[in-house]
Amino acid sequence: MSYSAPSQITQRQLAYFEGKHVLIAGELIDDFPFELAKHCESTSIFTTNYSYYKQFAGHNSIQCYFGSELTEPTNVDMILLYWPKAKAEAEYLLTMLLAKLGKNTEIVVVGENRSGVKSIEKMFADFGPINKFDSARRCSFYWGQCTEEAPTFNQQDWFKEYQVEFENHTIEVRSLPGVFSHGEFDKGSELLLQTLPALRGHVLDFGCGAGVIGSVMKTINPKIHLDMVDISALAIASSIETLKANNLEGNVFASDVYSDTKENYQFIVSNPPFHAGLKTHYSSTEELLEKAPQNLTHEGQLILVANSFLQYPPIIEKAFGECLTLAKNNKFKIYSAQK
């Protein structure tokens, strides 16, 4: 496959990685690590993306870690950070990894200029020197080294806490950087929750983010068996904390669409993601819709919110034979289909 632009600029600078024990993190979307592994002493990946983890897990040449925090011991002496779309997530990853790996760790940062990668210059200032060494494909390549003792990292310090009010219920939300709707109540989610019928049985919250939708559903329908899934380890950690903050019970786990779900559900409810990195991305939502019937019970129901311009109805109609519009405003529509 062709490499992403950040990987292409990294490919031009392979000499930086010769003889190094490299840990790759951030917004990595291609299989460039296999090529990089040929030039490094060792190559490992820390990813918060479950789909990407599954792609590399089991390969002998690359050790792959998935989670919201790197906890495993490692002999890494260089970080290759692909700049994520959220600046706060970049700061989270940088602080966490340098606290783990310590002084004298080298770092390479690559990213598209429009993603704000230039922010690394100020962000890294407390750790040591960093400079830009290459520009190509509208991307930048930075190299630096941690020459100061990195402060200790406590994940609890990184949760943003806020409240969501819905129909006389107050939900306490705890959200890590990089999680959808970080710090606010998404208007699409609000319309979805206003439109939902009474829920029963097993309910799946797909793309759970910080756990707002799942927590409201469980608060209003306390007898449901709630599964909450997301591809992001940061979202999983956030949803677990949000449930805990509201004394609610739910089963929260990573899943690449239906890869790890075990149930047939009475309801699949979703505010599905369509921004992956800086590009609009539909494939996971298409799979959610296409395979929904085989993951629903008899007369089970799919209900989702989407931006009005997204062409989901034809996919839903093909899967179910019909697609109903339950509600809409000037930006969002609520779609439903029954098995």
From Swiss-Prot:
Keywords: Cytoplasm, Methyltransferase, rRNA processing, S-adenosyl-L-methionine, Transferase. One of its GO terms (cellular component) is cytoplasm. Transmembrane segments: none annotated. One of its GO terms (molecular function) is 16S rRNA (guanine(1207)-N(2))-methyltransferase activity. InterPro entries: DNA_methylase_N6_adenine_CS, Mtase_sm_N, rRNA_ssu_MeTfrase_C, RsmC/RlmG, SAM-dependent_MTases_sf, Small_mtfrase_dom. It is an enzyme of class 2 (transferase). It catalyses: guanosine(1207) in 16S rRNA + S-adenosyl-L-methionine = N(2)-methylguanosine(1207) in 16S rRNA + S-adenosyl-L-homocysteine + H(+). It is found in: Cytoplasm. Belongs to the methyltransferase superfamily. RsmC family. Monomer. This is Ribosomal RNA small subunit methyltransferase C. It comes from Aliivibrio fischeri (strain ATCC 700601 / ES114).
